[in-house]
């Protein structure tokens, strides 16, 4: 008989009230009533009697080795002994017959859930994978007639999802059970109550029973658990599958999810904010429907959004009002005193905060020294050199060597910077000589590194500039206010093409 096809041995008798002993070397633990028996290994050959010697006679070793190599190199011509077909082996009928679907019910069982100790029993771990389908047989066993038997038969025909992983050892066993291992490291379990051993983990049966009893819990208790965890977010709905598993539907995105949306940290934060708001709470004993809780959560979110919009609108109104006040202050300046240093300093100081706060996107305040045409262009557009027929701006350049800006204007208007000529030095300039110096370029701009102003573009028809006037006036003393203002201008990071200074 083939050693791999021996029937399982009969379990050894055990005394009442004593735990089963450790299985012997080379054999599995004994099997109790209704439990599968582990496969036994072939018995070791008996030793010869005393005084007898066993003599092995072998032929030519080289011939035997050549035969082995020929069998591998030339498998077609080699004399390979044929194996015994599966049909000729002494296998039970259930090995060739797959189980029928009706055999899972209790009504199809003929032995009322018990099996004899000598009946060959097939467990999924020790049976052919081709004859048994995964998940087709629940923790029962097969008899030669293909009927499910075993103590694990349940009164219902419901098929549960089986776990495909081993339960860790730290999970406690039921009362009266003990886990042990064979010499080969395979685990088995001892039942001290029935004085039996088995390969099946009793914790799996406990988990399956818990899964069976979980859907049968009263709906009132389930509703209490759901209400205790809080209402669902707006647009979410809780549903249940046919197997009793809970899932969640998002009506906004038309999606479903197994994860509870109330566990999302974003929803928890919004719920905390809504709870901290001074909202009138209902009486503690009054029942609250889940729909009312959802509406309350949505109303709190809407109130927060409305409050945020109101704050943004109020901020925008304050910014527009500040700009309007600055424009009115610039319009009310007398044109006769527009060229005074105080007025120029006021215009420069009022222009910088607006550009820094608005990120350089708002219209700069027009300088009082500008002409009427430039003042109108500055008020109506974001760039004083756009939307004009006389001034043209260069395209955006990213390879410019200047570090202050990527935009430049090829030509500066003649009367654009003529109003700041009094701010260059501390020298006293006679007011009567001011009209004759309207076209004079300010000296303090030449002293700033990085400006590189092309003075040739500022020459007019009646402009006569001497050579000494083109030299930078570093030797002249500059006032501290002018230096502070220009440092703030150069340090600004957001003064691009809307800047009141033009970088060439």
From Swiss-Prot:
Transmembrane stretches, start-end: none
Tissues in which the protein is found: Increased expression seen in some liver and prostate cancers. Isoforms lacking the transactivation domain found in striatal neurons of patients with Huntington disease (at protein level).
Superkingdom of this protein's organism: Eukaryota
Resulting phenotype, residue 164 to A: In YAP-4SA; prevents phosphorylation by LATS1 and LATS2, promoting retention in the nucleus. Prevents phosphorylation by PRPK4
Domain WW: 171-204, 230-263
PROSITE patterns in alphabetical order: WW_DOMAIN_1, WW_DOMAIN_2
Signal peptide: none
Substitution effect: residue 91 to A: Complete loss of interaction with TEAD1
Outcome of substituting residue 86 to A: Complete loss of interaction with TEAD1
Keywords: Activator, Cell junction, Cell membrane, Coiled coil, Cytoplasm, Membrane, Nucleus, Phosphoprotein, Proto-oncogene, Repeat, Repressor, Tight junction, Transcription, Transcription regulation, Ubl conjugation
Comp. bias intervals (Polar residues): 355-391
Modified residues (Phosphotyrosine): 407
Induction: Induced in the hours following cyclic mechanical strain in keratinocytes.
Molecular function, one GO term: RNA polymerase II cis-regulatory region sequence-specific DNA binding
Phenotype when changing residue 261 to A: Reduced interaction with PRRG4
Main location class: cytoplasm
Role: Transcriptional regulator with dual roles as a coactivator and corepressor. Critical downstream regulatory target in the Hippo signaling pathway, crucial for organ size control and tumor suppression by restricting proliferation and promoting apoptosis. The Hippo signaling pathway core involves a kinase cascade featuring STK3/MST2 and STK4/MST1, along with its regulatory partner SAV1, which phosphorylates and activates LATS1/2 in complex with their regulatory protein, MOB1. This activation leads to the phosphorylation and inactivation of the YAP1 oncoprotein and WWTR1/TAZ.
Family, per entry: Belongs to the YAP1 family.
Name of the protein described by the UniProt record: Transcriptional coactivator YAP1
């Amino acid at each position: 008989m083939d050693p791999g096809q021996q029937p399982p041995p009969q379990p050894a008798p055990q005394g009442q009230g004593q735990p089963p002993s450790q299985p012997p070397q080379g054999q599995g633990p004994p099997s109790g009533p209704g439990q599968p028996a582990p496969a036994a290994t072939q018995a070791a050959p008996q030793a010869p009697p005393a005084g007898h010697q066993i003599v092995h006679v072998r032929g030519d070793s080289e011939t035997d080795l050549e035969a082995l190599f020929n069998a591998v190199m030339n498998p077609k011509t080699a004399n390979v002994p044929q194996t015994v077909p599966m049909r000729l082996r002494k296998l039970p009928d259930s090995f060739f017959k797959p189980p029928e679907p009706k055999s899972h019910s209790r009504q199809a069982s003929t032995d009322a859930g018990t099996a004899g100790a000598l009946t060959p029993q097939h467990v999924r771990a020790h049976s052919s994978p081709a004859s048994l389908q995964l998940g087709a047989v629940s923790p029962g066993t097969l008899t030669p007639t293909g009927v499910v038997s075993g103590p694990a038969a349940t009164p219902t025909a419901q098929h549960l999802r089986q776990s495909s992983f081993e339960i860790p050892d730290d999970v406690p066993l039921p009362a009266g059970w003990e886990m042990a291992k064979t010499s080969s490291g395979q685990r088995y379990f001892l039942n001290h109550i029935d004085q039996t051993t088995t390969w099946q983990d009793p914790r799996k049966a406990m988990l399956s029973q818990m899964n069976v009893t979980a859907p049968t819990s009263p709906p009132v208790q389930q509703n209490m658990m759901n209400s205790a965890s809080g209402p669902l977010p707006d647009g979410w709905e809780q549903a249940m599958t046919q197997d009793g598993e809970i899932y969640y539907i998002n009506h906004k995105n038309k999606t479903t999810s197994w994860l509870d949306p109330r566990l999302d940290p974003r929803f928890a934060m919004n719920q905390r904010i809504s709870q901290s708001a001074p909202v009138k709470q209902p009486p503690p004993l009054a029942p609250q429907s889940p729909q009312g809780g959802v509406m309350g959560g949505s109303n709190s979110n809407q109130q927060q959004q409305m409050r945020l919009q109101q704050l943004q609108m109020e901020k925008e109104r304050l910014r527009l009002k500040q700009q309007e006040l600055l424009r009115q202050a610039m319009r009310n300046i007398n044109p006769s005193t527009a060229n005074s240093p105080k007025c120029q300093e006021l215009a420069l100081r009022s222009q910088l905060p607006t550009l820094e706060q608005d990120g350089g996107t708002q219209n700069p305040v027009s300088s009082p020294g500008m002409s009427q045409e430039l003042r109108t262009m500055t008020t109506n557009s974001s760039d004083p050199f756009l939307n004009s027929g006389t001034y043209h701006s260069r395209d955006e350049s990213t390879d410019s060597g200047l570090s202050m800006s990527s935009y430049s204007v090829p030509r500066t208007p003649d009367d654009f910077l003529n109003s700041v000529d009094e701010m260059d030095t501390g020298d006293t300039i006679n007011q009567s000589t001011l009209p004759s110096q309207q076209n004079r370029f300010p000296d303090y701009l030449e002293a700033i590194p990085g400006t590189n102003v092309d003075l040739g573009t500022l020459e007019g028809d009646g402009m006569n500039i001497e050579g000494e006037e083109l030299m930078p006036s570093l030797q002249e003393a500059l006032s501290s206010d002018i230096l502070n203002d220009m440092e703030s201008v150069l340090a600004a990071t957001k003064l691009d093409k809307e800047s009141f200074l033009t970088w060439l």
